[in-house]
A protein has these predicted regions:
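Q-loop/switch helix immediately C-terminal to the Walker
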Residues: 85, 91-104, 116
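ABC ATPase NBD coupling module
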Residues: 64-80
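ABC-type ATPase nucleotide-binding domains, specifically the catalytic core motifs of the NBD
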Residues: 99-112, 123
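Helix-to-loop junction immediately C-terminal to a conserved catalytic motif
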Residues: 47
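Conserved ABC ATPase "signature" region
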Residues: 112-129
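Hydrophobic anchor residue at the start of the ABC signature
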Residues: 147
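Conserved ABC transporter NBD signature motif
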Residues: 55-65, 161
């Protein structure tokens, strides 16, 4: 199966040297970093926001740092991120935040997709008002909203960056269960989890794990 995400000889000073990673549709990789700044920098590099010192980041065999602005924008439409910051727009209601990518790219939110979003929120244990501004949400509710927004955009690549680290245990398990359920679908995206330190995710069984706290990274493959 062709690679959807590929990191070739990727070097980011202070984080990793000569990292090689390849993810195909439906596969899951886990990267452990030594700190929050390392996680953020790796995320920015993977999604094309910050060039590495050397090496390449490819999505669908296209090197992100050789693309022009329009080409990069087109590639990013197939990538969804769920981060510790959640990325919700403060002056948009929760539901508007969740549906914004669909409206922006397609101009419509199909009824079936809206129903899927509401069901996901319920499964995650969301108790907030979807018509309130995100400033009223708890941290866990902000992450839930960000996850649902990512899922309903039907990405080909999901990147989870530190979004699970500070969640209360039950919320973490709920979100991880839904992330795993997504990976069990026939059209599952590739998924990259980036976490900090020794956070344990017992429900997650990645195809490959990279511990970037070591140089060279410790690599564990699922057998």
């Amino acid at each position: 199966m062709p690679s959807l995400l590929e990191l070739r000889d990727l070097t980011i000073p202070g984080i990793v040297s000569n990292l090689n990673l390849s993810l195909s549709q439906g596969q899951v990789a886990l990267c452990r970093t030594s700190g929050e700044q390392e996680t953020k920098q790796l995320l920015r590099t993977v999604i094309g926001e910050s060039a590495p010192e050397s090496g390449s980041v490819l999505i669908d065999d296209q090197s992100l740092y050789q693309l022009d602005r329009d080409q990069l924008f087109k590639i990013r439409k197939s990538v969804a991120t769920v981060t510790a910051q959640a990325g919700l727009i403060s002056n948009l209601k929760v539901w508007e935040n969740i549906t914004l990518p669909l409206l922006y790219h397609h101009g419509i939110v199909p009824d079936q997709t809206a129903e899927k979003a509401l069901q996901l929120l319920e499964k995650l244990g969301y108790k907030g008002n979807i018509w309130s501004l995100p400033g009223h949400l708890s941290y866990a509710e902000r992450i839930m909203a960000a996850f649902v927004r990512a899922v309903i955009s039907s990405p080909r690549l999901m990147v989870y960056a530190e979004c699970l680290d500070d969640l209360p245990r039950q919320h973490r398990e709920n979100l991880l269960s839904q992330a795993i359920e997504l990976q069990n679908q026939p059209d599952a995206p590739a998924a990259l989890f980036i976490i900090t330190g020794d956070i344990q995710l017992p429900l997650l069984v990645p195809d490959i794990t990279y511990d970037l706290r070591y140089n060279p990274p410790q690599i564990t493959r699922q057998t």
